[in-house]
């Protein structure tokens, strides 16, 4: 049994997990702030920070690399043209997770994840 492999499975298959993170990332780029479970927010934080770091290079290849992950032209353009240049002087820490409440139906801890 291989422990400490670096990511959470989130109770999904690999394709479902990939689609979930992609959709959460697109929503975060478009809205700047979303509410999700704490565990999903932590996984999304790792995912989106890598994309922002890549996008901050500003090159054509960086643009293509971000599009390969997001598969959404509007979100990719917004990330590369508007969001990433704001963080050009930062080495990381582009997002913040703020715990908010427990979901009524299943008592899952929820949190806001937002771009700083």
UniProtKB/Swiss-Prot annotation:
It comes from the Bacteria. One of its GO terms (cellular component) is cytosolic large ribosomal subunit. GO terms for molecular function: structural constituent of ribosome. One of its GO terms (biological process) is translation. Keywords: Ribonucleoprotein, Ribosomal protein. SUPFAM superfamilies: Prokaryotic ribosomal protein L17. Belongs to the bacterial ribosomal protein bL17 family. NCBIfam families: L17. Part of the 50S ribosomal subunit. Contacts protein L32. This is Large ribosomal subunit protein bL17.
């Amino acid at each position: 049994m291989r422990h400490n492999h670096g990511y959470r499975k989130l109770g999904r298959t690999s394709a479902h997990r990939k689609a979930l993170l992609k959709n959460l990332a697109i929503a975060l780029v478009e809205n700047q702030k979303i509410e999700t479970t704490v565990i999903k927010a932590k996984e999304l934080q790792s995912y989106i920070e890598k994309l922002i770091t890549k996008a901050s290079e500003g090159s054509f290849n960086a643009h293509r690399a971000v599009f390969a992950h997001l598969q959404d032209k509007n979100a990719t353009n917004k990330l590369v043209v508007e969001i990433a240049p704001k963080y050009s002087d930062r080495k990381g820490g582009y997002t913040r997770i703020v715990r908010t409440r427990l979901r009524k139906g299943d008592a899952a801890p929820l949190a806001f994840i937002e771009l700083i």
